[in-house]
C-alpha cells in the first residue's frame, strides 16, 4: 500500500533524487498510440519504443504501460521478459509525467508526483486533456508500493531537470520560468521548490533549451550530469546550425559554473546532428481539435543528449545522420 506524504518535504525527511548514473532497479515506459501525434498510426513509433525496451532489457528490468486497446498488440510484440501493465495515459512520455524517484541513506525509496499539464497547459500545452497523464505517477507508485509527495498545482516534467545526486540541479530558465508552468511563482520560489523536493542545495540555470515550441526548452536535450563534477553538453561549431547559439551559450555557462560542492565542472562536448532533422509524413497524422497540428518540414528536436543511462550502458539515440557515429565515439570517451 502506497501512501501520500503530507506536511513535509523530501529534503526534510532525508530523501534526494539520485543521479541518472547511480544504480537502477528498472525502467518504466509508456506505449505510443496517438494518431494525432504519431505518424502512420504510431506504428513507426511503436517499433522505435520496442527497440529501446529491448536494448534496456539487456541491462535491467523494463515495464511498459499500455492502454487496454493496445495491450494485446504490445504484449505480443514486446519480449516476454518485459513486464506489460495495463494503464491509461494521454501519450507516451513517462519521463515527463511519471514519478521522480527518491532515495535516502538507509536504502529507502519514495517519489515525487509533480503536477503535469502537457508542457504548458492552456497557455501553450501540446494537447488537451492531460488528466490521464497526470495520474500516471500515482499509479506507478501504487504498483511499486512507494510512498509519494504530491506537488498539487506546482507543474514540472522529469525531462526539465537533471541532478548530480550530490546537491546540484541542472535546468533551463526557458522551461521552468515559462508562462504555462508556474506563472504565480518567482524564480527564487521555484528554486526553493526544486531544492526541497529533490533534496538539493544549488540550482544551475542554463538560459535556453533547443525546443521552445514543444517542451519549452527541456534540459534533457541540452546537458546532463554523467559523473560527480562532470557534465555532457551539446556542441556544434557550425554557425548555420539552428541550435548553434544555444549550444555555445550552454557550454560557456557550464564551463564557468561550480556545483553544490564547489567543484568547477568538467564539461564534455557531445555533437549535434550534422543536419537538422525535419518532420516527414505529417499527412499521415490525424488532425484533432485540442492538439497542435504537425507539418512537413518542421525541425524535429534531434539531440544525442537525450540518451538514457542504465546499469552498465548508455542507450544513445540515432537519427540516420552522418554524426551518429561521431556521437557514439564521443559518448564512449566520456
Predicted regions, residues:
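Histidine/cysteine-enriched polar flanking segments
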Residues: 1-334
